[in-house]
Amino acid sequence: MTTINKEEIQKFSSLADEWWDVKGKFKPLHMFNPIRIEYITQMIKKYFKISDKKINPFNELKILDIGCGGGLISEPMARLGANVTGIDASEKNIKIAQIHSEENNLKINYINSSPERLKEKEEFDIILNLEIIEHVEDVKLYIDSCSKLLKKGGLMFTATLNRTVVSYIKAIVGAEYILRWLPIGTHDWNKFIRPEELEKKLSIANFKTIEIKGLEFNPFNKKWKKSDNLSVNYIICSSKI
């Protein structure tokens, strides 16, 4: 069994060369990245009781970034001192990520793999699942695999899209067809997952929800912000019990 959807991997592999082009096809992700990093960093510090004054605050933490792409989240985590492993089912993405991290003198362990193939059981303090779960083939297997890789008491961040009329209008019609922020076909609305559905799946795999936050785009200042509105983008922070 596998969580890999070959069509999804091929889709993102074809864009691999553009990962670090802030004005290219991944421009929306570069715009989205600051709020993701801010939220994840704040929650990690709060959960693990890490002082804001500490230099390299994550230097005792092992982080697994699943579906790491070109390393847009892996690199900021490494700069904060974390021991980062980034995995992606696309070999081309991994090569791009490796080259970019080496150019920036960052030590990140990049592996062409998927979570069910890793052997590091209960190895990681934190797992990052950011905008990945809506692209996997088998959601249950994916979450179960994450649970096996995370230490008891560890944190997991799962960011995805809600399956609502609003998300269809904004994430599919708006982002792909009207604004052309994303290539047409990037998302399949039927694979979007409602927060209550995801919480249930996480609970079955021994995860307890700490917090759910919406992530909302402001078209006037072109910035993302945290929100209580879960109708489109949202992120669940959960701990393994």
Language model features with spans:
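Short, flexible, mixed-charge acidic loops at enzyme active sites
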Residues: S167-Y177
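Acceptor-substrate binding/catalytic loop of class I
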Residues: T160, R180-E197
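Conserved hydrophobic residues forming the short capping helix/wall of the S-adenosyl-L-methionine
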Residues: I44, F48, S101, L202
